[in-house]
């Protein structure tokens, strides 16, 4: 039975060059609908990084039309962004080269979210990031 205190939206994303932009637009509209515009910049950036990582590392050769699934959940003072992809490979944070121009997306996620992690699934994995929702930020 669904928990009425949990609000959720999900979107299936295609593995194409517009994937990250589509994810940001979906996130922006969802945050606007939920009255959480104050979180938009950080959340959109993190969603973009998680989706780009999934696209780059998990689905480069898949033929599935919607291999990436983005879920946004609001519950108990938190907003959680979760990206499901078909790969079972764990995400890797690159702490080696602080000046690298690429490969630093999870460092950004780590810096902006209050928590993040990943879980293996029967059909791949989910990588998630959580943000604190200020009670004044939502309706």
In which residue ranges do the predicted regions lie?
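Conserved short strand/loop->alpha-helix "switch" segment adjacent to the catalytic nucleotide/phosphoryl-transfer site
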Residues: 24-48
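Conserved beta-strand-loop-beta-strand hairpin that lines the nucleotide-binding pocket
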Residues: 1-10, 55-139
